A protein has these predicted regions:
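Conserved ABC transporter NBD signature motif
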Residues: 55-69, 73-74
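Conserved ABC ATPase "signature" region
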Residues: 98, 102, 109-127
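Catalytic Walker B motif of ABC-type/P-loop ATPase nucleotide-binding domains
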Residues: 156-160
Length: 249
């Protein structure tokens, strides 16, 4: 199970949002780190096939096959949690996931079991019959992760999954990704250093659409040239005046 990006490029008009991006993802948890405008969202939208590469702008391969040719079979392997998604306040958590299961074409009987399973994974089983309008921000975040898990995807893309969570809920997400990362490819986008260094097996630092460097936390901090060897100082080293975008560092 591999996701390979080769020389990927994406322009928005004259803006080069992703520049010659090449990387191979295998089973594990990967953190995409960088300030606003680094290219994280563009990269995720290309991987989820919500955006198309430039003409002659590289290729994205899933298990050796171009995703543009795989179509529905690729999307069936994919779970995506967007940073923002409409939640229906008058629906219960269970009904909301049932609605999304139907849209994904999951048979009703199978969906019932899956919904119970994903709610348990994000520790929302006791709130299954509660209306979403009464959920806290952290509960809504976990519900969005639950919907991404429907269909048991092999590739999971999470956009800012820990944004606005309290420490207890961050632990829930960390434990979940630790377990799922043993059998899935998980990409997590964030600009919060303190979160990603405890969640990710490998971290990719992006700036203005370019992959600056990547590695484990221990590998990355060895690149720090001045001061204490921390991921925060590496961030400052690479981003300088942009570093104030790394809230929570």
């Amino acid at each position: 199970m591999t996701l390979v990006l080769r020389h990927c490029n994406k322009h928005y008009g004259k803006k080069h949002a992703l520049k010659d991006f090449t990387f191979s993802f295998e089973t594990g948890v990967y953190g995409l780190l960088g300030p606003n405008g680094a290219g994280k969202s563009t990269l995720m939208n290309l991987i989820t096939d919500n955006l198309k590469l430039d003409k002659d702008g590289g290729e994205i391969l899933w298990d050796g096959q171009p995703i543009r040719k795989l179509g529905k079979s690729y999307r069936a392997c994919l779970g995506f949690m967007p940073q923002q998604q409409e939640l229906y306040a008058n629906m219960t958590a269970r009904d909301f996931l049932g609605y999304l299961s139907a849209l994904k074409g999951i048979p009703r009987k199978e969906a019932k079991d899956q919904i119970a399973d994903v709610l348990e994974q994000v520790e929302l089983s006791e709130q299954a019959a509660q209306k979403i309008g009464g959920f806290s921000g952290g509960m809504k975040q976990r519900l969005l992760i639950a919907q991404a898990l429907l269909g048991n995807p092999s590739l999971l893309i999470l956009d800012e999954p820990t944004a606005g969570l309290d420490p207890k809920q961050r632990v829930i997400i960390r434990n979940l990704t630790d377990r799922l990362g043993q059998e899935k490819i998980i990409l997590i986008s964030t600009h919060i250093i303190s979160d990603i260094e405890t969640i990710a097996d490998q971290i990719l630092l992006l700036r203005k659409g370019t992959l600056l460097t990547h590695g484990t936390v221990s590998e990355l901090i060895e690149q720090v040239q001045t001061g204490e060897k921390t991921l925060e100082n590496l961030y400052l080293q690479y981003y300088g005046g942009e570093a104030n975008a790394a809230g929570g560092a």
